[in-house]
Amino acid sequence: DVAPSRGLGDVYKRQGYELLDADLENIVIGQIEKIEKHPDADKLIICQVNIGTETVQIVTGAPNVKEGDKVPVVLDGGRVAGGHDGKKTPGGIEIKKGKLRGIDSYGMMCSIEELGSTREMYPEAPEYGIYIFPEDAVVGESAIKALGLDDVVFEYEITSNRVDCYGVLGIAREAAATFNEKFCPPVVECKGNDEKASDYVKVTVEDPKLCPRYCARVVKNVKIGPSPKWMQRCLASNGIRPINNLVDITNYVMEEYGQPMHA
């Protein structure tokens, strides 16, 4: 709430933080109106895609699209998180108009991986190919908002003298100081019982200099299952693949406090 995302990034760079990545940009819902075969490439097709304000031509090799499909379209000058292999690229990938085997292409249709997400979070997404929106998706609207991925993500290169900023709370504390605002850390209430973890497990610290303190808790009667979608999206935004509720909770707290955890 202290500043627009771009302004916050600019201020942080002046404070000495290197901005590596920002949010996805210029990605809308488009509907494929016409598909033709590429005259010079058997595995490519030429799509006429309605993006609400105009119809753009996009050349693709995706095997799963057909006329009438509604798909995420990144336009000329827009950015995606990475490639279809699911690996995020620092700074993202800027998409520019170009030619594919001699045919003009004015954008790109996206897989769920290129949008920085995974099939674990969106099981309806195909294993290979472009993400297809449901029929009620509105052409021309933000594809990122429709998918619930419209949170702004900054990736910073933290210098070795600022380990306090390895977690979200550290960055929030820095933002409060930068903008002369009050820092309001979350109030954590520790709930538990009188049982001792030492009654269940034994922890041996072999080198107190490297590990001056090790904390462990025993949690019983846990049902392993998927974590909530909001938590999965937060983790995926930080480059962490959601596993299950127990593992995801520890990773979420680690990202929040900068404290390594394991379950």
Question: Where do the PLM segments sit?
Answer:
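Glycine/proline-enriched, intrinsically flexible loops and inter-domain linkers
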Residues: R6, I45, F179, F183-A263
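Phosphate-backbone binding interfaces of nucleic-acid-interacting proteins
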Residues: S5-R6, D10-E195
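Short, well-ordered junction/capping motifs at the entry into regular secondary structure
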Residues: D1-V2
